[in-house]
Regions:
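Basic/polar phosphate-binding segments, predominantly the helix-turn-helix DNA-binding elements
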Residues: 29-62, 85-107
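Glycine/alanine-rich phosphate-binding loops at beta-alpha junctions
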Residues: 1-48
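Terminal helix-turn-helix DNA-binding modules in bacterial transcription factors
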Residues: 16, 20, 29, 52-88, ...
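Winged-helix/helix-turn-helix nucleic-acid-interaction surface
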Residues: 111
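A solvent-exposed interaction/effector surface
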Residues: 94, 102-106, 118-326
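Mid-sequence acidic-hydrophobic segments that form the walls
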Residues: 77, 99, 103, 114
Length: 326
């Protein structure tokens, strides 16, 4: 393993360790000294490498992650504010309030009374991003079959940002990063704070486990994709059809009517070694599917939405809009 590869993995291990300690309430282990010792490097060197790779100070990252977990409890439970503060390593109600307001511009009590969208510090995934950038560390074959089935999805709303020119996940976020307030960290943090997401499985990362999905919307102004369909790429969350909560100003929301979809699904996979193989396998399955025999065809009507769920702990799943041909 190269030194660069090794340090991306080291920082990823630190990030995972931080979340484990916060979740378990093991605050004594959540120190720079212990994290550095576990890697066999000095505190100074680990701090420097963390900042270099993640783009932020390690102590700041730990504080923001504590606040992100605390905010979810404020939003989703009736636990007392002081109890939440102490559970997440703050010494008093006042210390928690100061840190919370400095991070989100609102006090914990005001947020609980009126939970507006705020930018949470989602868990960073430096090693995953590095692997995607270099195409992974291997091309292990996946032995799982692709499941193909049809579903009817009820009417819902889709809160999102969109881009009419991007080509794929990385290009999407690269282009969005040049739009004020629409970079990946800001958007994922805002979406993480939204309550009531239909696909939220309680995950702590900015992926399908926390309800965040990539989508492709049939739009005549969009780029022509490899399937010959003009699409706008989008990123957001599905919400109930009657959702009436506040909406971040840089996002848009659309009504998605009830419709029929075809699903191409691969089960859990190892991101580091199987991601590329899973992508190739599921792309081939979509290419080979015989729509004529099924009695369905892809629905290219403007506004139909094609969802992409990527959560290596559960599945890789494409959900494409269809309509009956007979």
């Amino acid at each position: 393993m190269s030194e660069i590869n090794e340090w991306y993995m080291n920082i990823q291990n630190i990030v995972d360790d931080i979340d484990r300690c916060i979740k378990s309430g093991d605050d004594e282990k959540l120190t720079l000294g212990r994290l550095s010792k576990s890697l066999g490097y000095s505190e100074y060197y680990v701090s420097r490498k963390f900042s270099e790779i993640s783009g932020m100070n390690l102590r700041d990252y730990m504080r923001y992650r504590r606040l992100a977990f605390a905010l979810r409890e404020l939003r989703d439970t009736d636990k007392g504010i002081l109890d939440i503060a102490l559970d997440y390593g703050f010494t008093s109600h006042e210390a928690f309030t100061r840190a919370f307001k400095a991070a989100y511009g609102i006090t914990p009590s005001s947020y609980r009374s009126h939970p507006v969208p705020v930018i949470l510090r989602t868990a960073i995934r430096p090693f995953d991003c590095y692997l995607l950038g270099i195409g992974g560390t291997g091309m292990a074959q996946t032995n799982s079959d692709i499941k193909v089935y049809f579903v009817t999805i009820p009417a819902h709303k889709f809160l999102h940002i969109r881009n009419y020119e991007s080509i794929g996940y990385y290009d999407f976020w690269e282009k969005q990063s040049h739009i004020p307030g629409q970079d990946c960290a800001t958007i994922c943090g805002l979406l993480d704070s939204i309550k009531g997401k239909l696909d939220d499985m309680g995950g702590d990362e900015a992926d399908s486990g926390s309800g965040q999905v990539m989508a492709y919307i049939n739009e005549p102004e969009g780029r022509i994709c490899s399937w010959g369909i003009p699409l706008a790429e989008a990123y957001g969350v599905r919400l109930p059809a009657d959702y009436s909560g506040e909406m971040p100003k840089q996002m848009q929301i659309m009504d998605v009517p009830e419709g029929e979809y075809i699903v191409f699904e691969h089960g859990p996979f190892d991101f580091q070694t199987e991601n590329s193989a899973v992508e190739a396998k599921i792309e081939q399955a979509m290419k080979d599917f015989d729509y004529e025999k099924s009695g369905y065809e892809l629905d290219k009507t403007q506004g139909r939405v094609f969802y992409f769920y990527h959560d290596c702990k559960r599945y890789w799943k494409y959900i494409r809009p269809v309509r009956k041909t007979v």
